[in-house]
Amino acid sequence: MAKLLLLTLLGASLAFVGERLLAFRNSFGAVQELEPVEPQNCVLIEGLENGSEDIDILPSGLAFISSGLKYPGMPNFAPDEPGKIFLIDMNEKNPRAQELEISNGFEKESFNPHGISTFIDKDHTVYLYVVNHPHMKSTVEIFKFEEQQRSLVHLKTIKHELLKSVNNIVVLGPEQFYATRDHYFTNYVLALLEMFLDLHWTSVLFYSPKEVKVVAKGFSSANGITVSLDKKYVYVADATAKNVHVMEKHDNWDLTELKVIHLDTLVDNLSVDPATGDILAGCHPNGMKLLNYNPEDPPGSEVLRIQNVLSEKPRVSTVYTNDGSVLQGSTVASVYQGKILIGTIFHKTLYCVL
């Protein structure tokens, strides 16, 4: 009887592991084939060779870019170099990347920028908020942008016990922002186990100097986050669940889920087209190739546009797809006046005229 029970438990365990392995491979797009969709007028931006994980474009057309992210399990072509923030003027005929100088007093050697978000104050001062992972911790850095000097002045470092494994942020007021937590565990092995078991323990946080709280939870891997043009709705990407959550924002900053838009790809960062209100999503169509990077068979890139977000049937269309021959590991796409920038975790940056 004991042997029979043991064999039954062993069989059930093996069946569970097999099911999770198959689900894990499928969730990371291990079998997805890519059909190329590429605008004709595209060029790679010179000087951006080590990633452009997140991009935020001001109404003036100045684009901030975080570069050089060192993320557990992901490739990095310049592991000994600190991260950087670049600026691109989308109004230029041939846009070029310019590294922004950071003021003294900030620990540049451990700068590891991830998600970014801009905020323009009433006096038109531009502030850049950056998710930073110094020594693989999570902080949010606040910089003031000096446009004439093309530099960043570091103002403040935000730390909090809830701000762990932070991926992205969207700023809605002075020191008021939503942040996504992409893993419950900060240990890399436990984080992998968390993904393997699909625990849905990640969340969205709200931060202000007076209050820090969880405002939405139950995500497989909360990733990109942005806000609608009228600031009434918050859009959250759940990467490994392959969907986008549409959340209503309340006066107390709590979020209520209205709908979920299902996509057949791993969703990373989100942005909103300022002309239409459409969501643009940087995606990973074959995420398993990110975890097992092979330069001979690189991960591809994909950008989706979601129109009529609040309708019963949002329309999803493909803006860009590449098998990795041009662009590897896309994370974000941001548009300005018919032009688009597509960023990556560790690779290059693509500029296209749509």
Curated annotation (Swiss-Prot):
Name this protein carries in UniProt: Serum paraoxonase/lactonase 3
Organism phylogeny: Eukaryota, Metazoa, Chordata, Craniata, Vertebrata
Gene (name only): PON3
A Gene Ontology biological process term: response to toxic substance
Function as written in the Swiss-Prot or TrEMBL entry: Has low activity towards the organophosphate paraxon and aromatic carboxylic acid esters. Rapidly hydrolyzes lactones such as statin prodrugs (e.g. lovastatin). Hydrolyzes aromatic lactones and 5- or 6-member ring lactones with aliphatic substituents but not simple lactones or those with polar substituents.
Chief site of localization: secreted
Localization in the cell: Secreted, Extracellular space
Subunit details: Homodimer.
Domain of life: Eukaryota
Binding residues for Ca(2+) 2: D54, I116, N168
Binding sites annotated in the UniProt record for Ca(2+) 1: E53, N167, N223, D268, N269
Reported cofactor(s): Ca(2+)
Disulfide links within the chain: C42-C352
Keywords (A to Z) from UniProt: Calcium, Disulfide bond, Glycoprotein, Hydrolase, Metal-binding, Phosphoprotein, Secreted, Signal
Residues forming the catalytic site: H114 (proton acceptor)
GO cellular component terms attached to this protein's record: extracellular space
The reaction(s) this protein catalyses: a phenyl acetate + H2O = a phenol + acetate + H(+); An aryl dialkyl phosphate + H2O = dialkyl phosphate + an aryl alcohol; an N-acyl-L-homoserine lactone + H2O = an N-acyl-L-homoserine + H(+)
Residues listed as glycosylation sites in the UniProt record: N50, N269
